[in-house]
Design a protein with these regions (language model features):
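Noncatalytic, solvent-exposed loop/strand surfaces
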Residues: 1-247, 252, 256-263, 269
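Short flexible loop/turn segments that cap and initiate beta-strands
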Residues: 267-276
Length: 276
């Protein structure tokens, strides 16, 4: 399943963008679940995570395209200027929403990294490709392995950490017109996931081991964020009057002789709870 990319819109709504198993990129209201728009890319799943670049959403897939037999494509989709209101129909975006396409890109589940207007994507041929997010043109290409399936690159500390299917991981620096490998090693087991970074360390999971690279100093103790600090995502000053109701829980199972209590919240047009 595609990792979600969240965005807070000027109108107060919080949305997320994702690929779907039916070949679409979708925009969903994160508070209410309302589907706002969709754009079909392929006849198979869009399994990689999408990237937000200014007023576009960039996505890549590794299936057959809807308008040709070409396999794989990276596309920049322009976000619509206005979105449906509560209860209105989903927007179906067509080719007019396509800003650019790059037919040389094919990735099954690898999610691009994004930094300063550039996309860094590993593709099926085992290459790391730097793409200009404004134009869709390749900036540079590095061959790092025979092939690639699932793993994704990570941008951290001014460098790219790039795991590959054959167990190799490379540290790459973007030098403008080219990419340069600072170092590389081969790990035990295939790399299928994206690395993670925290407290000066990089964590890499293979099919056989979990590796930690970086600072030998003890990491600070983990402190969970108090739930109160996250309340602004659901509640806040109302924007207008209530426009919809939210029943909680939305999903439940009852056995004979049991009961279920519900809460009903009034939501404003941004999906925030304003009254119980």
């Amino acid at each position: 399943f595609s990792p979600l990319a969240f965005e807070d819109l000027p109108d107060g709504r919080r949305v997320f963008y994702s690929g779907t198993g039916c070949g679409h990129v979708v925009c969903i209201d994160a508070r209410t679940g309302q589907a706002l728009w969709r754009f079909q890319m392929s006849y198979g799943g869009v399994n990689s995570g999408v990237v937000i670049h200014e007023d576009t959403v960039v996505a890549i897939h590794g299936k057959e395209n809807v308008d040709s037999t070409v396999i794989g494509r990276m596309v920049a989709i322009r976000k619509p200027a206005s979105l449906p209101g509560v209860g209105e129909e989903i927007l179906v975006l067509g080719k007019e929403a396509e800003v650019w396409r790059n037919n040389s890109m094919e990735a099954f589940t690898s999610t691009p990294a994004y930094r300063n207007g550039r996309l860094y994507s590993t593709i099926k041929r085992g290459e790391l490709v730097c793409v200009d997010a404004e134009t869709g043109e390749d900036v540079w290409v590095l061959k790092l392995a025979p092939d690639q399936v699932h793993a994704s690159p990570l941008w951290a500390d001014g460098k790219l950490f790039v795991p590959m299917f054959d167990g190799r991981i490379s540290v790459v620096v973007d030098e403008g017109d080219s990419g340069r490998v600072l170092g590389k090693t081969t790990l035990d087991g295939a790399c299928l996931a994206a690395p993670s970074a925290a407290h000066g360390r990089v964590f890499v999971q293979t099919k056989k081991r979990l590796y930690c690279f970086g600072s030998p100093l003890p990491a600070p103790a983990f402190v969970a964020k108090p739930q109160e600090e996250l309340k602004h995502l659901l509640t806040g000053p109302p924007i207008g009057s209530a426009v919809s109701l939210q029943v909680v829980p939305a999903e439940f199972a009852l056995k004979s002789g049991t009961s279920q209590a519900f809460k009903v919240y009034a939501l404003d047009r941004t999906g925030r709870r304003i009254e119980e």
